[in-house]
């Protein structure tokens, strides 16, 4: 499975240091020529630090923690959850990218499935961290394959990146689409079935 972003070899990262984050935001405001002590900005460093704790909460979560509930019901056909909201942050510019994810899988031979909300939570685990869309897509697919052991997985993510909309080429509305396909869903007929379900409105 693609390893999450880590700072050591144990698959974990450091604790969130709110005071250090607050000081860093204050320094950034000074660096861009602002006065962090003026009325409108006086509380901004603290607000941003607390917001980052929430926005990057996925750094302190593991995919297996959200896929703990499974059911053996003998279902052997595709399960697909569409239009899962994606709210993430580009690790290159620390600005948002937003959109939707479609996550589908063919259960294992014993029919083991997970709760539908768990697929949305899995997307959040990987979205709520400094991220790139390509890695996010792969991590969701690989986590499902490793933890649920399904016969196949498909993940399609479609997002607008503020680093393209607000700066650089400045093309609001441009969408990036990434996909990851594993197992039996690599079969053209099965993949086409999944894509037709994803594209149906």
Swiss-Prot record:
Keyword list, A-Z: GTP-binding, Hydrolase, Metal-binding, Nucleotide-binding, One-carbon metabolism, Zinc
Pathway: Cofactor biosynthesis; 7,8-dihydroneopterin triphosphate biosynthesis; 7,8-dihydroneopterin triphosphate from GTP: step 1/1
Keyword Nucleotidyltransferase (UniProt): no
Binding residue positions for Zn(2+): 90, 93, 163
The UniProt record lists the keyword Hydrolase: yes
GO term, biological process aspect, one: one-carbon metabolic process
A GO cellular-component term linked to this record: cytoplasm
EC number(s) on file: 3.5.4.16
Reactions accelerated catalytically: GTP + H2O = 7,8-dihydroneopterin 3'-triphosphate + formate + H(+)
A GO MF term: GTP binding
Subunit (UniProt): Toroid-shaped homodecamer, composed of two pentamers of five dimers.
Family: Belongs to the GTP cyclohydrolase I family.
PANTHER family (UniProt xref): GTP CYCLOHYDROLASE 1, GTP CYCLOHYDROLASE I
Designated name of the protein: GTP cyclohydrolase 1
């Amino acid at each position: 499975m693609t390893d999450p972003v880590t700072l050591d070899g144990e698959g974990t990262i450091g604790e969130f240091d709110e005071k250090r984050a607050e000081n860093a935001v204050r320094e950034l405001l000074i660096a861009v020529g602002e006065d962090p002590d003026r009325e409108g900005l006086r509380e901004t460093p603290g607000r941003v630090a607390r917001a980052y704790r929430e926005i990057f909460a996925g750094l302190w979560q593991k995919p297996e923690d959200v896929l703990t509930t499974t059911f053996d019901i003998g279902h052997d056909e595709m399960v697909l959850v569409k239009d899962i909201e994606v709210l993430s942050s580009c690790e290159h510019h620390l600005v948002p990218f937003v959109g939707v994810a479609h996550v589908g899988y063919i259960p294992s031979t014993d029919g083991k499935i997970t709760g539908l909300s768990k697929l949305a939570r899995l997307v959040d685990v990987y979205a709520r961290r400094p991220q790139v869309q390509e890695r996010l897509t792969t991590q969701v697919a690989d986590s499902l394959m490793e933890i649920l052991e399904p016969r196949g997985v498909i993940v399609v993510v479609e997002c607008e990146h503020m680093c393209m909309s607000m700066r650089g080429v400045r093309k609001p509305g441009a969408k990036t689409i990434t996909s990851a396909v594993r197992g039996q869903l690599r079969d053209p007929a099965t993949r086409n079935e999944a894509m037709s379900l994803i594209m149906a409105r």
